[in-house]
């Protein structure tokens, strides 16, 4: 996201390539190199000013660091976005450092150690304004302290739902992911997000959906459904 005032903000950065062999049972396919994708948009990794990490599961922050082999020594992990402030909630950071049994396999310390060492980690404890037009709001359920960026343009507000609503099909309130650590909390938090999205005509971005990137949502009695598809190009 470009804010028009010099900020280039990246929301999550995917699985990366450091642990693909270790995670091969997920059967990843059609993976792309994020650096190449950014270059296609005339953005270098060094240009990114802020990285918002919705949470620290490997599939959302794996590209935060890159592995460099050291001759005769341990591998070195360097920041992929060396000039960027990295935004994480304090609740998620504490969960990352001291994970519960259900989430332990989703966290890799090497994804974040270089960021911590650099001093470019910013921990938020409450809903926070990053800059004009970008607000960071906290949601629990899938994991403690997940950040959902709310990106406001002249046309509408976009909600990067992360794993609060990972797929368009997940708009159905009772469809809770098996990966959610606290399913009842997930339901309540999803309803909170959907009520506002429907009433304010916000567009919800689905980060795990291969077919539907973004839609508005519509309330039907006590339930919700994905409604009109929305282009993401107007975000900037």
Which residues are covered by each model-predicted region?
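Metallo-beta-lactamase
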Residues: 29-43, 47-59, 71-138, 187-201
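Metal-dependent catalytic neighborhoods of phosphoester/phosphodiester hydrolases
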Residues: 62-74, 215-218
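Conserved beta-strand hairpin/beta-sheet module of binuclear metal-dependent hydrolase folds
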Residues: 1-36, 40, 148-163
